[in-house]
C-alpha cells in the first residue's frame, strides 16, 4: 500500500459522516511521505520543534505547537508518543512512530477523541510493522 493510500483511506476516512480537515505522514527528517490536499504548508523548524518535544516532553508547552503558521495550545498527550493540541473548536494530534510522524487536524463536528482514535490507530499499526 502506498503512503498516500494510508492518508486517503486510513486518516481521511469517514467517521459518522465526517472526516479530518487535513492529515499527513511526515518523516522525522521533515520529508513529506504523503499528505491530504488540505494539509498546511509547514516550515522545517516547525517539524523540528515537534520532534524535540517527543525527545524532551513539555518543550512545546510554553510556546505552543506551530504548524503552517497556526498555533495550537498543547494539551495532554502521551510522553514521547503522542502530542495533542487545541485551537478554537478544532485541534491536532501527532503520533510518533519509529520513522515518521502521523498528523491529523480536525474541526467540529469531529471530536478530539475521534481524531485521536484515527491517528493513533494508524500509528500503532505502523509501529507493529516496524515503521
Curated annotation (Swiss-Prot):
Keywords: Actin-binding, Allergen, Cytoplasm, Cytoskeleton, Disulfide bond, Phosphoprotein. SMART domains: PROF. A motif (Involved in PIP2 interaction) lies at residues 81-97. It comes from Corylus avellana. This is Profilin-5. The keyword Cytoplasm applies. InterPro entries: PFN (IPR048278), PFN_euk (IPR005455), PFN_sf (IPR036140), Profilin_CS (IPR027310). The modification Phosphothreonine is found at residue 111. It comes from the Eukaryota. Binds to actin and affects the structure of the cytoskeleton. At high concentrations, profilin prevents the polymerization of actin, whereas it enhances it at low concentrations. GO terms for cellular component: cell cortex; cytoskeleton. Phosphorylated by MAP kinases. Occurs in many kinds of cells as a complex with monomeric actin in a 1:1 ratio.
